[in-house]
Amino acid sequence: MNNATIIAIDGPAGAGKSTVSRLLAKELGYTYLDSGAMYRALAWALQREGVDLEAEAHVARALPELPLEFSTRGGSLLIHCGGKALEDELRNPEMAAYASRISQMRAVRTFLTEWQRKLAEAGKVVAEGRDTATVVFPHAGVKVFLTADPAARAGRRHAEYLAKGIRVDYAVLERQIRERDEADSTRCLAPLRPADGAVILDTSDLDISEVMSRLMDLIREKSRG
């Protein structure tokens, strides 16, 4: 795997990782690898099979038998479970909560880390998540840690849900984000932190065009060596 073909973007929930990664992949002609969608898909598949998400041993036993497939085409990540394409069902607060729960399980992280690395072998990728640069692709050619204050992140997530027709209370979202930050940064397994050599970018007061401009400058600088 050529390290120069991987751009790894980490950061807390709502920092803009998904939006920025999707735009970067399109701009560069890379594949967008959405690890959050992969965790939500796994949670959805486990629920579909009636697996108790609180029982790590049950989850670990179920993983090899799940009819879950990840692939890439035309720069996009495709997710199927039992022949069904998973898209909108993964984008709701409930599934995000389930994904957060199983993401703390070692067997789950190992399972999806292997999938992410396998997908990256097929070509150039922009990969995003919470341990993408620290664990999944520690030797990525470009490593970025996107962050923003919790209020700004809650506002962005609230707007995303409203755009999808999902009504969610802003205060609840902000509380969930703060709780998720605490859980992610203090967990024993792959805690949320900037990777060695990562560029830290606070997006609290930046719009998407400003973030993209800074990241493209960084990528050009890295490509020049």
Curated annotation (Swiss-Prot):
Reaction catalyzed: CMP + ATP = CDP + ADP; dCMP + ATP = dCDP + ADP
Documented EC number(s): 2.7.4.25
Gene3D superfamilies with a match to the protein in the record: P-loop containing nucleotide triphosphate hydrolases
Annotated localization: Cytoplasm
Record's keyword terms, sorted: ATP-binding, Cytoplasm, Kinase, Nucleotide-binding, Transferase
Domain of life where this protein originates: Bacteria
UniProt keyword annotation of Translocase present: no
Any one Pfam family match given in the protein's UniProt record, by short name: Cytidylate_kin
GO biological process terms held by the UniProt record: pyrimidine nucleotide metabolic process
Positions of ATP binding: G11, P12, A13, G14, A15, G16, K17, S18, T19
Family recorded in the similarity comment: Belongs to the cytidylate kinase family. Type 1 subfamily.
Name under which the protein is recorded: Cytidylate kinase
Organism: Syntrophobacter fumaroxidans (strain DSM 10017 / MPOB)
